[in-house]
Structures are given as structure tokens and as C-alpha cells.
Amino acid sequence: SRSTPVAGAAIAMAARKIHAKAKKIAAHLLEVSESDLDWEIDRFKVRGNEDQFKTMADIAFAAYQQPPEGLEPGLEAVHYYDPPNFTYPFGIYLCVVDIDKGTGESSIRRFYALDDCGTRINPMIIDGQIHGGLTEGFAVAMGQQMPFDEQGNLLGNTLMDYFLPTAVETPAWETDYTVTPSPHHPIGAK
């Protein structure tokens, strides 16, 4: 999907702005320097004092009720992302096919796929997208088509005539990945 390389970058940059403002507010509330704070999941903690912290809920409330002098009230950000260059995932694929010399029938014995989509944000979704893409490619390779007559009329206009592979026809994909973060994306996604 192309949503992470574009929208994901804008979200990451806006989140960084919110994080920076939240840190200023936490430092103000805790009466310490920003450099004395460490971030931990949902809170800023004073380094060396585990009991002195402010949660994001505390900070969000303070952002609207008692922001530090010079800071605009609120805890929100907008960022428009214009990528300096495009990012694309890539992969390598190997298909082992058996072909019956007499009939020409083919069957896929094994299919290996190695993909690199940069920083993996949500592995379950990525695996689903890879399997979906492989299945679509498999369908086209195995004869999926939309035939038209000479007048441009669609001949195969029902799913009875259109090859959509099911779990029965689809091979068991053997997938793996490597991660090479994109230098053109704030979180390395491709």
C-alpha cells in the first residue's frame, strides 16, 4: 500500500511536533529542564526519579488549561509531507513449477518470496498485503483475463468466467523479509 509512504510520513512528522510540545509542557509542569526528561510509552519521566512523571493525559489536560507562557493552548499539529524522492518496496521471487510434457498442465511445487518494504510498521498487515499481491500475480500468470470481442464487448462478464484463485488453487507462499529503511522517509517506510 502507498498510504504509509505518504500519509504515514505526514503522521510521523505531526506526531514529532506533538511530542516536542508535550515535552515542553511536561518540563514546565515538573519544573525541570526538557533535557532532564525521558520518554516512556505514555509519559515523560524525570531522569533518575521514577516517581516524578507526567502522563500524556496530564499533559493534554494542561495543554488546554495551563500551557506554559509563550505556548499556544492545545496539543495538536498539522504536517504536509512532500517527499524529496519516491520510495518503493522491492523483492525477489522464485517459483518452482512442474509441467506435464504430455498435457502442458502446470502445477506450482514451491514459491519463495523475499520482500523489503523498509521499516515494518504492522507485520500482520504487511504479510496480508504480500500474500494478496502474490495471489493476484499468480492469477494473472495462470490465465486470469478479461476477454473482449472485436466490438469491445466484454465476453467474460461474470465471476463464473473470471479466474479468482481461492485457497484451493493458491500455492502455500513461503515468505520472508529483509528491512532496509528508506533514506527518503522519516520512519524508513517504502
Residue ranges and their predicted role:
Residues S1-K190:
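C-terminal catalytic domains of large/alpha subunits in multi-subunit enzymes
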